Design a protein with these regions (language model features):
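Juxtamembrane membrane-water interface segments that cap and precede transmembrane helices
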Residues: 22-28, 182-205, 215-220
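Membrane-embedded helix bundles of polyisoprenyl
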Residues: 65-80, 92-97, 118
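Membrane-interface transmembrane helices that cradle and orient dolichyl/undecaprenyl
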Residues: 98-113
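Membrane-water interface signatures at transmembrane helix termini and the short loops
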Residues: 219-278
């Protein structure tokens, strides 16, 4: 059992196996295998690599641990069509890199370029999925916690956020298609909802359950760990706040896939705070239980896609 725990937590092979299972699950469950769907899958795998880089650079749990990427790819393999059909892989890639850029601005005096880049990526996301604009206050709070947000970086962020809109409107104006802006604005109101998906949508609830099972013990581990430095503590508080923002936003938006995919990306970083600690028997048992739950959800989703449980 200890060897299995160590393999899942520290071995790069575990992350590679999870990535391979994610690809196999995508081939089994996604009916229409288009080029765009393969691109979203590739972006999802790249986001898993970025999690390893973030964990090592900021030492959130253990710099040698590949557990965040493994947990994320395991969650992505449960229902990959959620990413392929709704383009959530692109949102994951854009959001992960924008957060990575902001986290690197810790106590930087001249971070205008980083803020412009990060908020340009978020602006592209908001252009494609307007409900993601709910995360903008959290990003500004992230800059405040990193002690790099001031007047110049704020206006750099504002310019970066509006830049994609100006580019798109300029292209539409030059091609005499500016009239499609009004229907786009009317579609934004249709994305506002006050209800979650029905229980029959396993693709959403399976991912939600997996995210919740990772986040809750991670928060407990963070509360019990009193030896964190100021930067690590600030990052963990921001990550917990981000997951909370995404969970609340799901109640008021129909863009479930984009919001849940971003929450699923952050959850392993929080969960690694508990799972990467050694000498904790409860943690080891919970990780085994989590592995069994993942195996059950994976078999259920693949079996449903193949028609075994219909």
């Amino acid at each position: 059992m200890k060897r299995l725990i160590h393999f899942i937590t520290y071995s790069k092979a575990a992350a590679y196996i999870a990535a391979l299972l994610c690809v196999v699950s995508w081939c089994v469950q996604v009916e229409e295998k288009t080029l765009s769907g393969a691109l979203w899958l590739l972006l999802t795998l790249l986001a898993g690599y970025l999690l390893v880089k973030v964990n090592r650079e900021f030492s959130l749990s253990d710099s040698k641990s590949t557990l965040p990427a493994t947990l994320y790819l395991m969650g992505s393999s449960i229902v990959p069509n959620l990413f392929a059909q709704h383009g959530a892989g692109m949102h994951v890639a854009l959001f992960s890199y924008s957060c990575y850029v902001l986290l690197r601005t810790y106590r930087e005096r001249c971070a205008m370029g980083s803020y412009f880049l990060a908020f340009t990526l978020i602006g592209i996301q908001c252009l494609l999925a307007p409900p993601l604009s709910l995360v903008l206050p959290w990003l500004l709070l992230c800059g405040a916690f990193m002690e790099s947000l001031h007047v110049r970086t704020f206006f750099a962020a504002l310019w970066g956020l509006l830049f994609p809109y100006w580019v798109v409107c300029g292209m539409l104006f030059l091609t005499d298609r500016i009239g499609i802006v009004a229907p786009y604005l009317r579609q934004i109101s249709s994305m506002i909802s006050n209800s979650l998906p029905p229980l029959s949508e396993f693709s959403w609830w399976g991912q939600f359950l997996w995210t919740l099972l990772i986040v809750v013990p991670g928060i407990i581990g963070i509360l019990l760990n009193l030896a964190m430095n100021l930067q690590t503590s600030a990052i963990f508080r921001l990550l917990i706040g981000a997951v909370g923002v995404f969970f609340v936003a799901m109640w008021f938006s129909t863009a479930y896939a984009a919001l849940l995919s971003c929450a699923l990306l952050i959850a392993p970083l929080i969960g690694s705070a508990m799972f990467a600690m050694g000498g904790n028997r409860v943690k080891d048992i919970y990780l085994i239980v989590l592995l069994l739950v993942w195996l059950f959800l994976l078999v259920l989703s693949c079996g449903t896609a193949c028609g075994f449980f219909n």
